[in-house]
Regions:
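Non-transmembrane alpha-helical segments in soluble domains
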Residues: 176, 180, 225, 291-295, ...
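Short, contiguous acidic/charged loop-to-helix segments that flank catalytic cores in large enzymes
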Residues: 212-216, 278, 320-322, 430-436, ...
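Short catalytic/ligand-binding loop motif for oxyanion handling, primarily in non-cytosolic enzymes
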Residues: 95-96, 151-153, 195-198, 243-246, ...
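Substrate-binding/active-site clefts of carbohydrate-active enzymes
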Residues: 127-137, 146-322
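Conserved alpha/beta catalytic core and glycan-binding cleft of carbohydrate-active enzymes
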Residues: 109-110, 299-301, 315-472, 500-555, ...
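Carbohydrate-interacting/catalytic domains
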Residues: 1-141, 168-179, 183, 436-438, ...
């Protein structure tokens, strides 16, 4: 039988659809026989057979080797759902039963056999695919989700929660209304490529082209994506292009050589997994094709790439130097993704200072659309964990992110990594009593959503979850029976709605002219204030991070205006301290300081925040003179106080 030729691009390292040839595919033989053809790249192998239930996993069907190192076979009479493996006779003398690296489906763990699957899905999401974009000047509010522990079916009793898992189709019906109610624009799924160990959360992958069978079939996952798109929700796939599980039945020493991984000390990661060898072009094509599968076959809207710092530097250590092969691969990957799917969103989890991560490849950048701002995350959580009395010395932590914000296109993330391994959940990290934690949680999220940058939150953050995440258990939905947690998730929904409907919070947010500090020196008071400037509207964000209120706190502006209250974190409906009538409208008065000639005076609640929508008014030509007179009077009072103290 004449087998399809492997495209030249595969061996050049820039193939994005190798899965169309490699792996298992239904076909018709020249004699009219219906069956499946198999193709696997194993250049170091001395022999390969296809084994499966069709022969009792015994002799197997011998495969033919091409000069390219690709082995092929045709087996008639097989059906979708049948299990198979490759028996690989390695260059080192080993004989190992291997899963198909390009399999589209795999049996449920602990089984490791590949499963024959077709990818002929019917989508009706054309309208969504036409209008989706990179959200540069639109809100991007991502809900990070672990499919197996968001919610379980009633009556689940298994310790690992597996009898409570929703399949992909069922999950869509449960999840989409929640996403819509809380105004998320996208859902980002922790890795769904097949993985043997639940506790790896998908980050130790074995089947890069297989949607995990824990939650159903490839067709059911396609239904999930299609359902999200029909309701206006994007789907982002978490992808692990740096390392893979070292299991003997998968990619490690696949043909008796270090085929996919490095063969030196850099071949193993800190997690005991194998690091991909980016200097082998066929490996680059493998990874590019795996990313391409999610974008092309499953209509995903973006890829979040995990642990990119471990690729940019050898072993993730800047002292060991830049891994130029990895940098070249990532540039090629992002360039290829953008060429084929230009409206997709491609994000990097990177904690290093490597330059130009989000610069286009034509400007020698790595080519990502967004980079997680790990510095913002650490500084924010550190500050809110600081005792109130020590916060004046830590005041700069909440200012620092804006010193470097415009160096990259940043996304602010409070992800799964921040609520595991003894780190505590977001609310439990905060300093103070239960009541103080609750008030500060509202203000912390106010800071997040009013700060420039796209947003991502792990599931449960919107509940004020106190228990650390456990992949074996569903979220503590009973929390919604408690007044604070129910009020907080409603506050979170309102905050997300404000973010989604106030253009000043997303339009032009990567332009330095669209942000201005108003109060950034009030370290003793713990007050921060800043302007978010839109094309037609300015918003004033005010935040008190201390445990006491500030009466008549002055904020100095460059223009006169009236102000309307948009959001009050201490409103009674969110469980806050403001039980009576609130002041909803404010006006500036003439006179200010620091060249800001107008003053807006507000009463700031303890640990509370305000969002005000500003409407400019006609300037007073005497305002500058009034400011100067105030400044002179202040100097005189200061001098008089000094003289009287002598």
């Amino acid at each position: 039988m004449n087998y399809p030729a492997i495209p030249r691009e595969f061996f050049n390292g820039d193939c994005f659809d190798a899965y169309r040839i490699l792996g298992a595919h239904p076909c018709t033989a020249p004699d009219g026989a219906e069956g499946w053809r198999f193709a696997v790249w194993a250049p170091g192998a001395t022999a390969v057979e296809v084994c499966g239930g069709f022969d009792g996993w015994e002799a197997g069907v011998p495969m033919e080797r091409a000069e390219t190192g690709v082995w092929s076979a045709f087996i008639p009479g097989l059906a979708e759902g049948d299990l198979y493996k490759y028996r690989v006779h390695g260059a080192d003398g080993s004989v190992v039963m291997r899963s198909d690296p390009y399999a589209f489906s795999t049996e449920l763990r602990p089984g490791t056999a590949s499963r024959l699957a077709k990818l002929d899905f019917a989508f009706d999401d054309h309208a969504w695919m036409e209008r989706r974009d990179k959200c540069r000047n639109r809100p991007l509010n991502i809900y990070e989700l672990h499919a197996g522990s968001w919610k379980h079916k009633p009556g689940s009793t298994q310790p690992d929660g597996s009898d409570g898992w929703y399949n992909y189709e069922e999950l869509a019906k449960e999840l989409i209304p929640w996403l819509l109610d809380h105004h998320f624009t996208h859902v980002e799924l922790l890795p769904l490529a097949e993985h043997p160990f639940d506790g790896s959360w998908g980050y130790q992958t074995t089947g890069y082209f297989s949607v995990t069978s824990r939650y159903g079939t490839p067709a059911q996952f396609a239904v999930f994506v299609n359902a999200c798109h029909r309701m206006g929700i994007g789907v982002i796939m978490d992808f692990v292009p740096v390392h893979f599980a070292a299991n003997a039945d998968a990619l490690a020493k696949f043909d008796g050589t270090h085929l996919y991984e490095y063969d030196s000390d850099v071949g193993q990661s800190e997690w005991g997994t194998c690091n991909f060898n980016y200097y082998r072009r066929e490996v680059c094509s493998f990874l590019s094709s795996a990313a391409g599968l999610w974008m092309d076959v499953y209509h995903c809207d973006g890829i979040r790439m995990d642990a990119i710092s471990r690729a940019l530097y050898w072993q993730g250590d800047p002292n060991r130097g830049v891994n130029q092969g990895a940098v070249n691969f990532l540039r090629s990957l992002n360039h290829g993704l953008n060429k084929r799917w230009p409206t997709g969103i491609y994000m990097a989890e990177d904690s290093t200072n490597f330059l130009k991560v989000t610069a286009p490849t034509r400007y020698e950048g790595v080519g990502f659309d967004y980079k997680w701002d790990m510095g913002w995350m650490h500084d924010t959580l550190d500050y809110f964990a600081t005792p109130f009395g020590e916060r004046p010395n830590a005041y700069g932590k909440l200012l620092f992110s804006m010193h470097y914000f415009y160096n990259e296109l940043y996304l602010l993330a409070l992800s799964h990594d921040e609520v595991v391994h003894g780190k505590k959940t977001i609310i439990d990290k905060l300093w103070g009593t239960y009541a103080e934690k609750c008030a500060q949680l509202r203000t912390l999220y106010f800071y997040m959503y009013m700060h420039p940058g796209k947003k991502l939150n792990f599931m449960g953050n919107e509940l004020g979850h106190f228990r650390e995440w456990d992949e074996k258990r569903e979220l503590d939905w009973d929390l919604l029976k408690y007044p604070f947690h129910d009020a907080f998730q409603k506050y979170f929904a309102r905050l997300s709605l404000v973010y989604a409907t106030e253009p000043a919070l997303f339009d032009g947010e990567y332009n330095p002219d669209c942000f201005e500090w108003v109060a950034s020196e009030s370290c003793t008071e713990g007050v921060y204030a800043w302007l978010r400037k839109g094309r037609s509207q300015n918003l004033l964000c005010i935040m008190n991070t201390q445990d006491h209120a500030h009466k008549k706190f002055p904020l100095y502006l460059k223009f006169p205006c009236s102000a309307e209250l948009v959001l009050d974190t201490e409103a009674a409906e969110w469980g806050g301290a403001h039980k009576g009538r609130r002041k909803l409208h404010f006006h500036t008065t003439d006179g200010g300081v620091y060249g800001r000639d107008y003053t807006l005076t507000v009463d700031l609640p303890a640990m509370g925040s305000f969002l005000l929508r500003l409407t400019p008014e006609a300037p007073n030509p005497d305002a500058a003179r009034i400011s100067a007179n105030k400044a002179m009077a202040q100097k005189r009072r200061t001098a008089r106080d000094k003289n009287s103290s002598k």
